[in-house]
Amino acid sequence: PPPRGAAGAFPGRRCFIRINMEKPTDTAIRPLHETELPAASALAGRVFAEFEAPEYSPEGIGAFLRFAAPETLAAQHRNGSMQSWGAFRQGTLIGIITLTRRSHLCLLFVEKACHRQGIARALFSALRDHCRTAPDTPRITVNSSPYAVEAYRRLGFRATGGERTVDGIRFTPMEYLFI
């Protein structure tokens, strides 16, 4: 009789196909070093330009680029007001997530070629696990761009208000509650 399990047989033939149903585990998530912040800034800028900037005013684009500039990120990391994690594949940075104010997610970007591969979820999982260890942190907040609202919903966030615009940046305030 033909073997059973992950291998399948074509009726009447002794031909088998082995299917690997597991997702590759070649992505490493770890805290970013200050020397990696320029690459993180560049990644955020590329992804923002393609997916979010078309919906923003010039004022909003400028505000984002100033916030995500390498020198701004480095200054905030140095003074302890920001922490960032990166997703790496074969040593290449493919995604970033950033935390401010102990529980506010402010940057989550994944290279276009790596979308829908669980990278954002893995980055959020690292950030969430970090926040769970902090005292008096009942939730994680985010100001989601219009493009990312549905992705944040899939991660377990819920909107806490309607869309707003501040300094040209369009966003929906959302939160993730630790239950």
Predicted features by range, described:
Residues 5-8, 12:
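Residue-identity detector for glycine
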Residues 13-38:
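Conserved N-terminal entry element of GNAT/NAT acetyltransferase domains
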Residues 20-22, 133-134, 147, 165, ...:
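Terminal substrate-recognition subdomain of acyl/acetyltransferases
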Residues 31-34, 42-112, 124-126, 130, ...:
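Acetyl-CoA-dependent GNAT
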Residues 82, 139, 169-171:
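Short coil/loop residues immediately preceding or within conserved phosphate-binding loops
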Residues 116-129, 154:
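Conserved acetyl-CoA-binding loop-helix of GNAT-fold acetyltransferases
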Residues 121, 146-162, 166-170:
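Conserved active-site alpha-helix within GNAT-family acetyltransferase domains
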Residues 131-144:
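Conserved GNAT acetyl-CoA-binding A-motif
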